[in-house]
UniProtKB/Swiss-Prot annotation:
Entry's EC annotation: 6.-.-.-
Protein name, UniProt field: Putative cysteine ligase BshC
Residues holding ADP: 146, 384-386, 490-493, 506, 510
Phenotype of null mutants: Mutant accumulates GlcN-Mal and does not produce BSH.
Entry coiled-coil feature ranges: 455-475
Disulfide bonds: none
Amino acid sequence: MQLTELSIKNQNVFVQHYIDGKEEMSSFFDYSIHHKDMWRERLEDLSSRFFAREELAAYLTSYHNKFGSSAMQSAIEKLKDPSSAAVVGGQQAGLLTGPLYTIHKIISIIVLAKQQEKELQVPVIPIFWVAGEDHDLDEINFVHTSEENGPVKKKLPQSYWKKSSAASTSLDQEKCAAWIDDVFAAFEETDHTNTLLDNVKRCLRESVTFTDFFELLIADLFQEEGLVLLNSGDPGIKKLETAMFQKILRENDELARAVSDQQAFMRQAGYKPIIESGKEQANLFYEYEDERFLIEKDNGRFVIKELDLGWTRDELHTHMEEHPERFSNNVVTRPLMQEFLIPTLAFIAGPGEINYWGELKQAFAVMGFKMPPVMPRLNITILERHIEKKLAERNISLQDAIERGTENQRETYFERQIPEEFTAVMDQAKSQIEAIHKTVRQEALKVDQSLEPLLLKNAAFIQDQLQFLERTVMKRIEEKEGYVLKDYERIQNSIKPLLAPQERIWNIMYYLNRYGPKFFTTFKNLPFSFQNQHQVVKL
């Protein structure tokens, strides 16, 4: 296995300017990731803040008992050290761990935590924030598999409440087991298949919810690294979040204004905000009968219109004290809650997160916080040996394949195989036959004007026959050149499936099935670096 790097620009202008260290980024973030003293500055800032370390460690210790991992428990123990900090990143609880970028994000968290622990000489804990309170299950209930004509979305055929969270939605064991079999049936059977499949199904049997299943698989892959999981949808964490829920309530109007002002500033600077937020939103959700509902503001009251529920500010404050488990964060308040709970040395962010965190600088300030350093996660492409070979055979650069895919090269190659004379003769035939037929039509219409529809239909039929002949010849060329054309498709399906980055479509199970556990051990321990280069892992 070999690690190389490529320089690939991000298509999001704001993200690329952040990566490039443009001066105007200081208006959106509190720390510059390009500043050499940034880590010590952040550590010093954290030292002046209070964190409920003992309480958080006690909760996490209890929560992690189910994983039976001494490395995880040792990492949690480090949180009690007042000098310790954490590298944090998060993602939704996707089935079979979700797209590859979830794995890449976790590797980013672990790599940066190890690097900074060595550099700063303080304990640095890798923490993965599992978005268990997220209720958009349609974003996590599928994986893509590679079929004859490219990637196919395989969706778990299970119904659930529309607004129920991942942490409270039970998996249908029978349907999920059958779905897993269906996913693995799309893989080529190898020496690793049965062991991997048995392990995945064991994790399923030990799970109740989407979040359980996700966490067990992640723990199985990363527990040796001491990765700590924080499930935001677990009722147990809510007691520690109560004071922050109440602070969000107290500062609610100011918080909404801060987000709105920052977004306006972002637009003025020529960038595009992505958070959909309004001043009538309270930026908190309320759980009612296993479904999540957005709390809104209406004439000084906090309401849930769908349920005809409402509270005064004081009533809601008391309700938070009595039932914190009923409340959860939205896209605005989740980063703030993370900052309240965890001494965060750095936040590992995907491109979309970099954009929306840039919309929250003033929101952090309203809460009395500085936004933690936002580190772009590692962008990784896995290059299989047979694909690398085909790139060389077809004279395609890896950079081109990653940035643009191979559809255009395939089309260009195919067009070159069509004899120029054939194309010219076909165009000439269509034109000449139409000219002759037009003369015939004109003469026929002199006999009977009512023949016009029939004559036009006849002309179209003749042209259709010519096009049929043309398509038949094209099909023969495609069959003749099938092996080469298929190479272009194989490259695209591996590196730029559906014209998206590999890490957004494919799932780690394909690689674990094909290359086995040793592949993953080597993969996660590669010497990745945070130089904002695209990482290429050659197998």
